[in-house]
Amino acid sequence: MALRFIDYKVQNSVFTLTPDIAPNRNYKIMPKISCNLRRTQERLICTFVVELAHGDQPIPFEFKLTAVGTFSVDAADDVSSFTVKAAETVYPFVRQSVAQLTLMANIPPYMLPMIDMADVIGGAKKVTLSVPNANLS
């Protein structure tokens, strides 16, 4: 009974810098983060989608990133015990990808918040949340 990390890939990333953003202004960033876990024979697929779009308040950029982590599991394994570990393994890569996207736009890198996957996911196979984050200035 083991979960083995195979790889991680960014399947899609879209980043748009908002024109005419005000310098030295605080922006309240509320990303929508979803995690979907599914099993295919001897694989566990962990897909994260992170979205940030304009809502009621202006923000300096919009993005959508889809990242997939692939794990190997034994055919007889009950993967419900692996869901938290899989999400905990992939999420740091997702955080780094988002930070790198913002850094390449020549703005301060945006770090997604830390998330306690055990609290959020538990044994669920699909979770979506909006995470309040510190203001970005």
Question: Where on the chain are the PLM-derived regions?
Answer:
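N-terminal intrinsically disordered, cationic/polar leader segments
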Residues: 1-89, 96-137
